[in-house]
Amino acid sequence: MGRYSGHGGTHTKKKQYKRARSTKNRAKDIDQIFDEIQPETIDKFSKFEVDPDLPGMGQNYCIHCSKHFVTNEDLQSHIKGKPHKIRVKELKTKPYSLAESQIPVDNGVKLNRDANGVPTTTDVTGTIKKSTTTTTTTTTV
């Protein structure tokens, strides 16, 4: 089906405003929250001073979801909810880190060629073996 007349274009101006709103209201990433809930840093991030700019004066805070709530009842109902339980489940596993991304991948046997162009294989142990592939020709009379 085609588009209706008068609805041309991609509405890029709306996309700009949506992008600005989404980046302004962006929540913390899993790896940042994982670092905050470690035993050595949990005291620093779990206690807040009274701040009139935050909801509930900054006293009702869910450390797993990184959200402030207006009342303690709102916090308790949030803890019983599904989004909180999903976030806690995600935080049980260690997040993917930069160091893990830089580990080289070992896929087993690697095929290299020597100076003559003959394929040689290198084992996982590092020993080099020459491949012994021979070609046979058959003649038909």
Swiss-Prot record:
<keyword id="KW-0963">Cytoplasm</keyword>
<comment type="subunit">
    <text>Associates with pre-60S ribosomal particles; released from the pre-60S particle very early in the cytoplasm.</text>
</comment>
<dbReference type="InterPro" id="IPR013087">
    <property type="entry name" value="Znf_C2H2_type"/>
</dbReference>
<dbReference type="GO" id="GO:0003676">
    <property type="term" value="F:nucleic acid binding"/>
</dbReference>
<keyword id="KW-0479">Metal-binding</keyword>
<keyword id="KW-0862">Zinc</keyword>
<dbReference type="InterPro" id="IPR022755">
    <property type="entry name" value="Znf_C2H2_jaz"/>
</dbReference>
<dbReference type="Pfam" id="PF12171">
    <property type="entry name" value="zf-C2H2_jaz"/>
</dbReference>
<comment type="similarity">
    <text>Belongs to the ZNF593/BUD20 C2H2-type zinc-finger protein family.</text>
</comment>
<dbReference type="GO" id="GO:0042254">
    <property type="term" value="P:ribosome biogenesis"/>
</dbReference>
<feature type="compositionally biased region" description="Basic residues">
    <location>
        <begin position="10"/>
        <end position="25"/>
    </location>
</feature>
<dbReference type="GO" id="GO:0005634">
    <property type="term" value="C:nucleus"/>
</dbReference>
<keyword id="KW-0863">Zinc-finger</keyword>
<dbReference type="InterPro" id="IPR003604">
    <property type="entry name" value="Matrin/U1-like-C_Znf_C2H2"/>
</dbReference>
<protein>
    <recommendedName>
        <fullName>Zinc finger protein 593 homolog</fullName>
    </recommendedName>
</protein>
<dbReference type="GO" id="GO:0008270">
    <property type="term" value="F:zinc ion binding"/>
</dbReference>
<dbReference type="InterPro" id="IPR036236">
    <property type="entry name" value="Znf_C2H2_sf"/>
</dbReference>
<keyword id="KW-0690">Ribosome biogenesis</keyword>
<dbReference type="GO" id="GO:0005737">
    <property type="term" value="C:cytoplasm"/>
</dbReference>
<feature type="zinc finger region" description="C2H2-type">
    <location>
        <begin position="60"/>
        <end position="84"/>
    </location>
</feature>
<feature type="region of interest" description="Disordered">
    <location>
        <begin position="1"/>
        <end position="32"/>
    </location>
</feature>
<keyword id="KW-0539">Nucleus</keyword>
<dbReference type="InterPro" id="IPR051879">
    <property type="entry name" value="C2H2-ZF_Maturation_Protein"/>
</dbReference>
<comment type="function">
    <text>Involved in pre-60S ribosomal particles maturation by promoting the nuclear export of the 60S ribosome.</text>
</comment>
